Amino acid sequence: MVRAGAVGTHLPASGLDIFGDLRKMNKRQLYYQVLNFAMIVSSALMIWKGLIVLTGSESPIVVVLSGSMEPAFHRGDLLFLTNFREDPIRAGEIVVFKVEGRDIPIVHRVIKVHEKDNGDIKFLTKGDNNEVDDRGLYKEGQNWLEKKDVVGRARGFLPYVGMVTIIMNDYPKFKYALLAVMGAYVLLKRES
């Protein structure tokens, strides 16, 4: 007979009796699992902060949320960004920018660059699949974007990998269920 909580054993639970499994753990196992979970979360945060420093972008990875950039990028594509201040913005580049008053960044192509004599650079964007430029998306009275509006420039992508994020935002119950299952797995997984 196998005793619950014995090292290297795991008794299958009938259904998902998460709290029953937690009660069966001794305090040391529970502390270990909580610490393990905290290490996973803090490691993910450190990797994210490291990417921010390496890429110069406040958001080094973004998901394309609409079809406005088709055929170049589709809804759900994952973009990798850089935003080095010394690199000039050129027509034809795909940029991710934020508009004052909007929470979600926009992924569009630079179609015109306007450089003043004093060195100030302004530019105009448009989605590849859109009929008109983005002036209607900019804040009222703004006709051009400036470098400060740019979150990053697309340097690479993974097709459709970001659909998981879109599904989790479109169906919040799915997101919470997935997070609960992952959290329960980390807490209840026992080392052999």
From Swiss-Prot:
Positions in the Lumenal compartment: 49-192
Ranges facing Cytoplasmic side: 2-28
InterPro entries per record: LexA/Signal_pep-like_sf, Pept_S26A_signal_pept_1_CS, Pept_S26A_signal_pept_1_Ser-AS, Peptidase_S24_S26A/B/C, Peptidase_S26, Peptidase_S26B
One annotated GO molecular function: peptidase activity
Localisation per UniProt entry: Endoplasmic reticulum membrane
Gene Ontology cellular-component annotations: endoplasmic reticulum membrane; signal peptidase complex
Region spans: C-terminal short (CTS) helix: 177-188
Protein's UniProt keywords contain Hydrolase: yes
Bilayer topology term: Single-pass type II membrane protein
Catalytic activity: Cleavage of hydrophobic, N-terminal signal or leader sequences from secreted and periplasmic proteins
Main subcellular location: endoplasmic reticulum
Active site: 68 (charge relay system), 108 (charge relay system), 134 (charge relay system)
SUPFAM superfamilies with a match to the protein in the record: LexA/Signal peptidase
Statement: the UniProt record of this protein carries the keyword Nucleotide-binding: no
Post-translational modification: May undergo processing at the N-terminus.
Gene3D superfamilies per record: Umud Fragment, subunit A
Record keywords: Endoplasmic reticulum, Hydrolase, Membrane, Protease, Signal-anchor, Transmembrane, Transmembrane helix
EC number per UniProt: 3.4.21.89
Gene Ontology terms: biological process: signal peptide processing
Membrane-spanning ranges: 29-48
Function: Catalytic component of the signal peptidase complex (SPC) which catalyzes the cleavage of N-terminal signal sequences from nascent proteins as they are translocated into the lumen of the endoplasmic reticulum. Specifically cleaves N-terminal signal peptides that contain a hydrophobic alpha-helix (h-region) shorter than 18-20 amino acids.
Entry remark concerning the domains of this protein: The C-terminal short (CTS) helix is essential for catalytic activity. It may be accommodated as a transmembrane helix in the thinned membrane environment of the complex, similarly to the signal peptide in the complex substrates.
Subunit composition and interactions: Component of the signal peptidase complex paralog C (SPC-C) composed of a catalytic subunit SEC11C and three accessory subunits SPCS1, SPCS2 and SPCS3. Within the complex, interacts with SPCS2 and SPCS3. The complex induces a local thinning of the ER membrane which is used to measure the length of the signal peptide (SP) h-region of protein substrates. This ensures the selectivity of the complex towards h-regions shorter than 18-20 amino acids.
Entry's family note: Belongs to the peptidase S26B family.
Protein name, UniProt field: Signal peptidase complex catalytic subunit SEC11C
Organism: Canis lupus familiaris
